[in-house]
């Protein structure tokens, strides 16, 4: 296929798609140019069904530093593991694409997005999402798209689609919404305490804008789209399914209704093991035993799936016996740990998170050097999910995509209520350790983070709580669930996380397993989430009503002084010599910004005070008319040099020593002698002249003797 180009304009920027020129061996490939951002997307599919009980979809978003005219950092000067932003963008693209493949599709699919050029005012992630959908849609991969996504901002009561950098900085909302022509299927958002009504309107505005992008994709697919390949879907043997359902459905139904998680898991596992043992023995000699046992496992999973959903939609019974809008038992604790700067333990049913606060000087902020211009990140929220939290063994290592994503969600939720840098000049790190999990651990980490911040004396604007909403839908009827647990998340259709204060929403995240959800479902879920959020805030505020007025004794204290910008180099010294000497003497940490704000950190107030004295002395300037108690440091024929303070000397000319004539300076002064002097002149080069005699009353002139006349 020869190169074909398609052009339109979206949100005020040119959107150009090129097909047929590059990556022609992939099943589908596109080059998307949005503004001056260029993204190459290639989609490929394995020829055979993969083994395993899940759909092996891999979406990558690769930031090439040359796209922004930069060298990669590090010794190797080569791109390494994906940045946090790249990982989050890959997840952002994966989530709306995944539900658009048929149930039972098991061929491996890879979608690789490579950023070739970067324009900070034209969203490369949105171009990559568009390119991912289009590459799949024009390929022979059986993708039931297209989908598209947009960013939505909110400025002065107006919604902005795909805002540029300046607009996003002024926006009260940073929303990414994706979906198909019919419905929304992915949401990711941070917001400055916006109401449910505004958030819902933003979602609908975003979905409306998506239609234009989907229509453009459909136009391209009509011209260059390939016929979809026939692939084998994972389907179980119908006779085998009927046999197992008839024999064991009642036992599995009973096991599913055990309320306590561990007991329920043990009961369902016992039924499954009994079934597997029977059919493994029955078909032990069959050459297709592996396929039969795979089908048995899939049938049992489908039976459990169907029963959980039936109980909720028909009987309105949840696995743990709760009402549809009921939250699990809550508990909130502060000061769980000694020595740390703040800690909070939050428990919701069998989900528990411990959050630990650490405060540090601003010099500890994280430097982010990606495609965008380098910047410093003051607030970090890290989320850890050890396998023991679900009573299992498993790998331990660096944070995976899920942990990075959950940490970022908590960061967005809590960042909106943090004090400004001027109010609270600290770098802030929260670490959420998930100690138990039965669903919604990311929201528990937000609640625990609020407790830790307030216990640590961080003056947040308001406490934040989070809740996860679920959905069970059969296409006609649906049930929205409050505070979903693991089983409801696993077998449900939606995981809709909502975090916020009493004033409004600070973060949203939605993932679904069906093609999309309607505005009515969104509205109902937001309303239920608000009610639940307020219940959780009641518990948090009963534990700690407001941030403590003082920091923990172990937290670094801070004092700030202002110096002239041209004095920064004096405090730092050549090669950092002066500031290093101050730090070595006092044991403090010092940060100096470009505007001359000097922040001094230490747990010892005396050390802070001593540091302030030293710096004040370094930047002190002599002023004409001021009097100083000085020390003679050098004597010359023409006068004496005296030290006024620190490194500031002045010349007392021989004529300024006394009102009477001084013949030899050394007859009057000696090195080391203390004298009081007054500054009388500072020239354009900063040289200081001082006077001793200016502090001495001038003696009266002697009266002239009258001449006698004869």
Curated annotation (Swiss-Prot):
Origin superkingdom: Bacteria
Cofactor annotation: Mg(2+)
Any one Gene Ontology BP term: RNA processing
One Pfam family hit: RNase_PH
Domain KH span(s) in chain numbering: 556-615
Keyword terms: Cytoplasm, Magnesium, Metal-binding, Nucleotidyltransferase, RNA-binding, Transferase
Stored InterPro entries: ExoRNase_PH_dom1, ExoRNase_PH_dom2, ExoRNase_PH_dom2_sf, KH_dom, KH_dom_type_1, KH_dom_type_1_sf, NA-bd_OB-fold, PNPase
Region feature Disordered, mapped onto this chain: 691-710
The reaction(s) this protein catalyses: RNA(n+1) + phosphate = RNA(n) + a ribonucleoside 5'-diphosphate
Cited PROSITE patterns: KH_TYPE_1, S1
Its job: Involved in mRNA degradation. Catalyzes the phosphorolysis of single-stranded polyribonucleotides processively in the 3'- to 5'-direction.
Protein name: Polyribonucleotide nucleotidyltransferase
């Amino acid at each position: 296929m020869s190169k074909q180009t398609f052009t339109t304009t979206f949100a005020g920027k040119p959107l150009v798609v090129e097909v047929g020129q590059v990556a022609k061996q992939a099943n589908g490939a596109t080059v998307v140019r949005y503004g001056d951002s260029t993204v190459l997307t290639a989609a490929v599919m394995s020829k055979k069904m993969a083994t395993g009980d899940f759909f092996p979809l891999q979406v990558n978003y690769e930031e090439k530093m040359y796209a922004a005219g930069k060298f990669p950092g590090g010794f190797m000067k080569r791109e390494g593991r994906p940045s946090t932003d790249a990982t989050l963008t890959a997840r952002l693209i994966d989530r709306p694409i995944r539900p658009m493949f048929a149930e039972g599709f098991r061929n491996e699919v890879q979608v690789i997005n490579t950023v070739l050029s970067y324009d900070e005012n034209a969203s490369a992630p949105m171009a990559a999402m568009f390119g991912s959908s289009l590459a799949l849609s024009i390929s022979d991969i059986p993708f039931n798209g297209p989908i598209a996504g947009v960013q939505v901002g909110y400025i002065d009561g107006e919604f902005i689609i795909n805002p540029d950098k300046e607009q996003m900085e002024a926006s009260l909302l940073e929303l990414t919404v994706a979906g198909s022509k019919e419905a929304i299927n992915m949401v990711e958002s941070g917001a400055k305490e916006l109401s449910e009504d505004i958030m819902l309107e933003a979602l609908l505005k975003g979905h409306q804008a998506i239609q234009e992008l989907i229509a453009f994709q459909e136009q391209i697919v009509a011209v260059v789209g390939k016929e979809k390949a026939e692939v084998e879907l994972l389907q179980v043997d119908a006779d085998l399914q009927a046999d197992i359902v008839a024999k064991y459905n009642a036992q599995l139904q009973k096991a599913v209704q055990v309320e306590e998680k561990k007991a329920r898991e043990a009961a369902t596992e016992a039924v499954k093991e009994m079934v597997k043992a029977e059919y493994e023995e029955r078909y032990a000699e069959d050459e297709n035993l592996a396929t039969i046992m795979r089908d048995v496992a899939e049938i049992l999973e489908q039976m459990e799936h169907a029963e959980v959903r039936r109980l909720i939609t028909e009987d309105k019974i949840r696995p743990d016996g709760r009402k549809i809008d009921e939250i699990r038992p809550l508990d909130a604790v502060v000061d769980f740990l000694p020595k740390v700067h703040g800690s909070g333990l939050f428990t919701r049913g069998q989900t528990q998170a411990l959050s630990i606060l650490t405060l540090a000087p601003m010099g500890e902020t994280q430097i982010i050097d990606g495609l965008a211009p380098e910047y410093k990140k003051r607030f970090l929220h890290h989320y850890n999910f050890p396998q023991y939290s679900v009573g299992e063994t498993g790998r331990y290592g660096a944070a995976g995509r899920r942990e990075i994503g959950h940490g970022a969600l908590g960061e967005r939720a809590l960042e909106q209520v943090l004090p400004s840098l001027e109010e609270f000049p600290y770098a802030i790190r929260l670490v959420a350790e998930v100690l138990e999990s039965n669903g919604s651990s990311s929201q528990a980490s937000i609640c625990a983070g609020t407790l830790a911040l307030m216990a640590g004396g961080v003056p947040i604007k308001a406490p934040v709580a989070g809740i996860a909403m679920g959905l069970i839908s059969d296409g006609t009827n649906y049930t929205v669930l409050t505070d979903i647990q693991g089983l409801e998340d696993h077998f449900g259709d939606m995981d809709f996380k909502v975090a916020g204060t009493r004033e409004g929403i600070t973060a949203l995240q939605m993932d679904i397993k069906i093609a999309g959800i309607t505005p009515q479902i969104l509205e109902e879920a937001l309303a239920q989430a608000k009610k639940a959020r307020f219940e959780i805030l009641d518990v948090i505020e009963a534990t700690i009503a407001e941030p403590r007025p003082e920091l923990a004794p172990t937290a670094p204290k801070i004092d700030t002084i202002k110096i002239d910008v041209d004095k920064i180099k004096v405090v730092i010294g050549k090669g950092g010599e002066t500031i290093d000497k101050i730090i070595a003497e006092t044991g403090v940490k010092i940060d100096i910004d470009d505007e001359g704000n000097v922040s001094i950190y230490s747990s010892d107030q005396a050390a802070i005070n001593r540091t302030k004295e030293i710096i004040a002395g370094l930047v002190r300037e002599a002023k004409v008319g001021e009097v100083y108690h000085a020390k003679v440091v050098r004597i010359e024929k023409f006068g004496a040099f005296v030290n006024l303070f620190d490194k500031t000397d002045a010349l007392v000319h021989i004529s300024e020593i006394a009102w009477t004539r001084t013949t030899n300076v050394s007859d009057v002064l000696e090195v080391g002698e203390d004298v009081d002097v007054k500054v009388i002149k500072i020239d354009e080069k900063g040289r200081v002249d001082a006077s001793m005699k200016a502090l001495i009353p001038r003696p009266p002139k002697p009266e002239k003797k009258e001449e006698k006349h004869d």
